[in-house]
């Protein structure tokens, strides 16, 4: 059983990461990703995945906590588990720290309703990105 002090220490020492993956769909991908995250003591806090029958691609987005702040270590563990599982298809895999704010260019049509919504969310902190330009 974990006491409150240990739980608090573990919480402070963890880093939140976001993992995204796109690869040709085949059985065992989610299992390999989960095993790779377990190898780095990762704890999945949020997960969304789907297979797209039209493109035959598997897409996954996972938010996780790990004791390491090195995103490349997390990515390497997942890549290794995919290889161990026999997944040799090309994999587009990205792991970044959750607090890293990506730069996003917003491109809009002449109708501004979507732009207004995006800027509202950004200004209120609901959309954690940096917006250098709107075109």
Feature map (PLM): residue ranges:
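A conserved regulatory-domain signal marking ACT and ACT-like small-molecule sensing domains
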Residues: 2-102
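Short glycine-enriched loop/turn motifs at secondary-structure junctions
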Residues: 14-15, 127-129
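Acidic/polar active-site rim loop that often engages polyanionic ligands
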Residues: 58-60, 124-128
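Short, glycine-rich nucleotide/cofactor-binding loops
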Residues: 104-114
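Histidine-anchored nucleotide/phosphate-binding helix
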Residues: 114-124
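Short internal beta-strands
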Residues: 130-135
């Amino acid at each position: 059983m974990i006491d409150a002090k240990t739980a608090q220490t573990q919480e402070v020492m963890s880093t939140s990461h976001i993992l995204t993956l796109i690869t040709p769909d085949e059985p065992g991908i989610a299992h390999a990703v989960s095993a790779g995250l377990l190898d780095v003591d990762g704890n999945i806090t949020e997960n969304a995945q789907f297979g797209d029958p039209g493109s035959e691609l598997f897409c996954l987005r996972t938010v996780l906590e790990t004791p390491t702040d090195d995103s490349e270590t997390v990515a390497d563990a997942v890549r290794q588990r995919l290889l161990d599982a026999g997944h040799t298809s090309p994999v587009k895999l990205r792991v970044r720290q959750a607090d890293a704010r990506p730069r996003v260019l917003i491109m809009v049509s002449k109708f501004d309703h979507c732009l207004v919504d995006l800027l509202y969310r950004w200004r209120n902190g609901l959309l954690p990105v940096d917006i250098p330009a709107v075109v």
